[in-house]
C-alpha cells in the first residue's frame, strides 16, 4: 500500500518536472538549456527513486516490528490466562476436597444424632414408667398422711405457706429495720461531715445591716443649709427620696432613716453630692436625686454581674442579674440578702462537689433562691413562689425553678438539688451571728415557745435554749407514756409552725423520766 503511494508521488513529481521542462523548452529554444534541464530531471528522478526505496525499507521494518510486538503481547496474555486458569482449577479442586470432607463429617454426625435420639427415646420411656410409679407412690403416701393427720393436702399446704410467709415477713421486717438504721446512721454522719466541710471551706465577710444611715458633715453650719429657708430644702429632699432626715444635736452628722435600703442609699448619695457641690436648693436637689437613682440602678446591675462572675455562673438573664443586685439593698433579720445568697451559692457548690452532682447548677440555684425578695411589696405571694415564677419567666431550667420553689416547703422537695439549697439556706441563716433581731422580739419568741409547750396536758415545765432554736419539754411520767412522747413532740412542733414565725428550724425535745426514791434507815 505504501509502495503504490510512493509510485504515485514519483509519477506526480515526474509529471511536474516534465511540465516544467516543456515550459522551459517552449520559452527557451537553446539546446544547452534543454540538455541542462534533462540532466536535472534525470538527477531528480534518480533521487526520488532512492528516497522511495528508503521509505519502502523503513515501512517494511516498522511492519515487522508491529507484527513481532503483537505476537509477543498475545503470547504473554495467553501465558497469564493459562496461569490464572491453573490457579482457579487448583482452588476448585481444593474446595471440592473440602466439601467431600464436610459431607463425610455431616454423615458421621447424622449417624451420631440418630443414635442419641434412639437412646433418649428409650430413656424417656423408662422415665415415663418411673414417673407413673412415683405418682402412684405419692398418691398413696398423701392418702396415708391425710388419714393420719386428719387434714387434706390443700389444708396442710395452706398452713405451711402461711407459716413460711409469716417467717419471711418477720425476716424481711428485721432486715429492713437494720438497713434503715444503718442508712440513717450513715446518712446523718455523712451529711454532718459534708456540712462541716462546707462551713469550714467558706468564711464570708458579714456586717450587720441597719435601718439608718449616717452622713458626715464638714461642719455644723451645713445643717442650716440642708434645712434651708423655712425648711424647704429638707422637705424637697425627703419628698424626692422618701427618706426621713433627722438633724439633731449629733455633731457634724445627719441621720437618714427609712426601711427601704434602696431609697436610703439614693438619699445618702444625693446628700453627699449636694454637700460636696455646695449648691443646695429644691431644683438642684431634684436633679441630684435623679442622677443618684441612675447610679444606684447601675450599681445594682454591676453587683448582679459581679456575683455571677465570682460564682462562675453564666447565661443568666440581664433582668435577673439586676434583681440579684437589688438584693444588696435588702435585709432579712438584719442579714444582707445579697451576701446571704452568695454564701448559700458557695455552700451549695461545696456540698454538690462532695456529693458528685453538678456544681454549676447547685451554685446557680443557691444564688437565685431568694430572688423573690428583690421584688417590691406590690407583687403578692411568698418570696419563694415569686422567685420561682421570675426564674421560669426568664428561662431558667425546671430544676432551678423547683429548687427555688421548694426551699421554704412551698413545694415538696423532689430533687437532691432542692434539698441542697434548703440545707445551705439553713446553714447560712441559722449559724450564730448571721442574723440579729430586736431584744423584745427575741424575748417574746422564747416566751411564746415555752407557752405553747406548756399548753399541752401532762407537761410540767419547758425551757427554750440555744437562742430559741431548741426547746426541752419536761412531762409527767404518770400522765405521758413513752409511746405518747413522740406524738406530743409532733403536736408541739405542729402548733409552733402554725402560731409562730421564726428563722431556720426549732428542735423539740420531750423528756420523760421515772424516779424511784427509797430511804435506808
Curated annotation (Swiss-Prot):
Keywords, A to Z, come to: Cell membrane, Endonuclease, Hydrolase, Membrane, Nuclease, RNA-binding, Transmembrane, Transmembrane helix
Q: Which cysteines are joined by disulfide bonds?
A: none
| Membrane topology qualifier | Single-pass membrane protein
Give me the Gene Ontology terms describing cellular component: plasma membrane
Q: Which HAMAP family match?
A: RNase_Y (MF_00335)
Family stated for the protein in its record = Belongs to the RNase Y family.
Q: State the name under which the record lists this protein.
A: Ribonuclease Y
Amino acid at each position: 500500500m505504501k509502495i503504490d503511494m510512493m509510485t504515485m508521488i514519483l509519477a506526480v513529481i515526474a509529471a511536474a518536472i516534465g511540465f516544467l521542462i516543456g515550459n522551459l523548452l517552449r520559452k527557451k529554444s537553446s539546446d544547452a538549456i534543454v540538455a541542462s534541464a534533462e540532466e536535472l530531471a534525470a538527477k531528480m528522478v534518480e533521487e526520488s527513486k532512492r528516497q522511495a526505496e528508503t521509505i519502502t525499507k523503513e515501512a517494511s521494518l516498522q511492519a515487522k516490528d508491529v507484527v513481532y510486538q503483537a505476537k509477543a503481547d498475545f503470547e504473554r496474555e495467553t501465558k497469564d490466562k493459562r496461569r490464572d486458569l491453573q490457579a482457579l482449577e487448583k482452588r476448585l479442586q481444593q474446595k471440592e476436597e473440602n466439601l467431600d470432607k464436610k459431607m463425610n463429617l455431616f454423615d458421621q454426625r447424622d449417624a451420631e444424632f440418630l443414635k442419641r435420639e434412639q437412646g433418649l427415646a428409650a430413656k424417656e420411656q423408662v422415665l415415663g414408667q418411673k414417673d407413673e410409679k412415683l405418682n402412684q407412690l405419692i398418691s398413696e403416701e398423701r392418702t396415708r398422711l391425710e388419714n393420719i393427720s386428719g387434714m387434706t393436702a390443700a389444708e396442710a399446704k395452706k398452713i405451711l405457706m402461711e407459716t413460711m410467709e409469716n417467717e419471711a415477713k418477720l425476716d424481711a421486717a428485721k432486715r429492713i429495720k437494720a438497713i434503715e438504721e444503718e442508712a440513717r446512721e450513715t446518712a446523718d454522719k455523712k451529711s454532718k461531715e459534708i456540712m462541716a466541710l462546707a462551713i469550714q471551706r467558706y468564711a464570708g465577710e458579714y456586717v450587720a445591716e441597719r435601718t439608718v444611715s449616717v452622713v458626715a458633715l464638714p461642719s455644723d453650719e451645713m445643717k442650716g443649709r440642708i434645712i434651708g429657708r423655712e425648711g424647704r430644702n429638707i422637705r424637697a429632699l425627703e419628698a424626692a427620696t422618701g427618706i426621713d432626715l433627722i438633724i439633731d444635736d449629733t455633731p457634724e452628722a445627719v441621720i437618714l432613716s427609712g426601711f427601704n435600703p434602696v431609697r436610703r442609699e439614693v438619699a445618702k448619695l444625693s446628700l453627699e453630692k449636694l454637700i460636696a457641690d455646695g449648691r443646695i436648693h429644691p431644683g438642684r436637689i431634684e436633679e441630684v436625686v435623679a442622677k443618684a437613682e441612675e447610679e444606684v440602678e447601675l450599681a445594682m446591675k454591676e453587683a448582679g454581674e459581679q456575683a455571677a462572675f465570682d460564682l462562675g455562673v453564666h447565661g443568666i438573664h440581664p433582668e435577673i442579674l439586676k434583681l440579684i443586685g437589688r438584693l444588696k439593698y435588702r435585709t432579712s433579720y438584719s442579714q444582707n440578702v445579697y451576701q446571704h445568697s452568695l454564701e448559700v451559692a458557695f455552700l451549695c457548690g461545696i456540698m454538690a462537689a462532695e456529693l458528685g452532682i453538678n456544681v454549676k447548677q447547685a451554685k446557680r440555684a443557691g444564688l437565685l433562691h431568694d430572688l423573690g425578695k428583690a421584688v417590691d411589696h406590690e407583687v403578692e405571694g411568698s418570696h419563694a413562689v415569686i422567685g420561682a415564677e421570675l426564674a421560669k419567666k426568664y428561662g431558667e431550667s425546671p430544676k432551678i425553678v423547683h429548687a427555688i420553689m421548694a426551699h421554704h416547703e412551698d413545694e415538696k422537695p423532689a430533687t437532691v438539688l432542692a434539698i441542697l439549697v434548703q440545707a445551705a439556706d439553713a446553714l447560712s441563716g441559722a449559724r450564730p451571728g448571721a442574723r440579729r433581731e430586736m431584744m423584745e422580739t427575741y424575748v417574746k419568741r422564747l416566751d411564746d415557745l415555752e407557752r405553747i409547750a406548756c399548753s399541752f396536758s401532762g407537761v410540767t415545765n419547758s425551757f427554750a435554749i440555744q437562742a430559741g432554736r431548741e426547746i426541752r419539754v419536761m412531762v409527767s411520767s404518770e400522765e405521758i407514756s413513752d409511746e405518747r412522747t413522740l406524738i406530743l413532740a409532733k403536736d408541739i412542733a405542729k402548733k409552733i409552725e402554725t402560731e409562730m414565725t421564726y428563722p431556720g428550724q426549732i428542735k423539740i425535745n420531750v423528756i420523760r423520766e421515772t424516779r424511784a426514791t427509797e430511804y435506808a434507815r
